[in-house]
Amino acid sequence: MSGPQRTGTGGGSRRAVVTGLGVLSPHGTGVEAHWKAVADGTSSLGPVTREGCAHLPLRVAGEVHGFDAAETVEDRFLVQTDRFTHFALSATQHALADARFGRADVDSPYSVGVVTAAGSGGGEFGQRELQNLWGHGSRHVGPYQSIAWFYAASTGQVSIRNDFKGPCGVVAADEAGGLDALAHAALAVRNGTDTVVCGATEAPLAPYSIVCQLGYPELSRATEPDRAYRPFTEAACGFAPAEGGAVLVVEEEAAARERGADVRATVAGHAATFTGAGRWAESREGLARAIQGALAEAGCRPEEVDVVFADALGVPEADRAEALALADALGPHAARVPVTAPKTGTGRAYCAAPVLDVATAVLAMEHGLIPPTPHVLDVCHDLDLVTGRARPAEPRTALVLARGLMGSNSALVLRRGAVPPEGR
């Protein structure tokens, strides 16, 4: 295996910092609702209630309830976009408001870019149009089908709605894509873009989308929410999927300070590898190399890591590989550093899951509290997994991990607030 791919997120005179968070998760809409539930160790997993799903073998998921896209998104965008893009448009609005970033802060539309990640695309919109095609004929298929299903739809619609004309793109790296999108945003900032809106949202719970996922052996078929997603335990039986996601505002530090923005965190380092689909034993080396690459880029020693947000797939072989990868990369510190996986309370939102973890990591560093891992009690690996209740701490450096079902591995290092040139 060759060395990990580093994206150049750390170092250099132009430092990428996080100034705004926008969250839509099964815990609720907005940062406050999400953080309260995460800090309390609440689980929002429940029975799948979407229409047309009752006959499917997937019984438990993390649904976003009470979301009304019309409250934040204009009709002209709603009619041509899927639910996953509705999430992205709304989360972007929340993130920009959180960053206090408005039209007056945009020197030029070319100074603001958009990077998202997507794994399932517009399945709900696509299902409706396919039903029109086969039930009524091609004349009943709307023109927006050609764009609404596409993975890049959210990037395009966010940029159009906000008149952002800087570097734009979409990352297709399976579940690791969320971290990779943030890394690409940081790289764009380092290369001269002042601001990048980045993140991932997913809506994979329409019947058509669920059917497409049933081929994943890693998908949990458990029928009880408290048993469906329990990584790092002997009872692990896969993961429960989820919808929702998060969008972040990433800015060049000097530009952010000039406009008086609060620097929430610094994107210090990132690296990625690829080990192939379903090869969970091999993912040990790939993930370890990604961790080592991210730490090297951040100029971070293993013992400086204060908290790890685990990928936590919920498959015994994959969980074992992740625990061993942490030991390989962090050495003795791997058994001492607090590890958490709050996604067990929301479900695994594919590309959006690690972006939610990044948002949660920023909040954990700000609040001095490491959230617990819901549903997990008896850990069968040599990890200090935070369970039961949140743990008071003063984390200043967070390591966020992500792996995709197709073999992508990604690691990201965040530092609390601004980081002086000499490091921590």
Curated annotation (Swiss-Prot):
<protein>
    <recommendedName>
        <fullName>Putative polyketide beta-ketoacyl synthase 2</fullName>
        <ecNumber>2.3.1.-</ecNumber>
    </recommendedName>
</protein>
<dbReference type="GO" id="GO:0006633">
    <property type="term" value="P:fatty acid biosynthetic process"/>
</dbReference>
<dbReference type="InterPro" id="IPR000794">
    <property type="entry name" value="Beta-ketoacyl_synthase"/>
</dbReference>
<dbReference type="InterPro" id="IPR014030">
    <property type="entry name" value="Ketoacyl_synth_N"/>
</dbReference>
<comment type="function">
    <text>Involved in developmentally regulated synthesis of a compound biosynthetically related to polyketide antibiotics which is essential for spore color in Streptomyces coelicolor.</text>
</comment>
<keyword id="KW-0045">Antibiotic biosynthesis</keyword>
<dbReference type="GO" id="GO:0017000">
    <property type="term" value="P:antibiotic biosynthetic process"/>
</dbReference>
<dbReference type="Pfam" id="PF00109">
    <property type="entry name" value="ketoacyl-synt"/>
</dbReference>
<feature type="domain" description="Ketosynthase family 3 (KS3)">
    <location>
        <begin position="13"/>
        <end position="416"/>
    </location>
</feature>
<dbReference type="GO" id="GO:0004315">
    <property type="term" value="F:3-oxoacyl-[acyl-carrier-protein] synthase activity"/>
</dbReference>
<dbReference type="InterPro" id="IPR020841">
    <property type="entry name" value="PKS_Beta-ketoAc_synthase_dom"/>
</dbReference>
<dbReference type="InterPro" id="IPR016039">
    <property type="entry name" value="Thiolase-like"/>
</dbReference>
<keyword id="KW-0808">Transferase</keyword>
<dbReference type="InterPro" id="IPR014031">
    <property type="entry name" value="Ketoacyl_synth_C"/>
</dbReference>
<comment type="similarity">
    <text>Belongs to the thiolase-like superfamily. Beta-ketoacyl-ACP synthases family.</text>
</comment>
<dbReference type="Pfam" id="PF02801">
    <property type="entry name" value="Ketoacyl-synt_C"/>
</dbReference>
<keyword id="KW-0012">Acyltransferase</keyword>
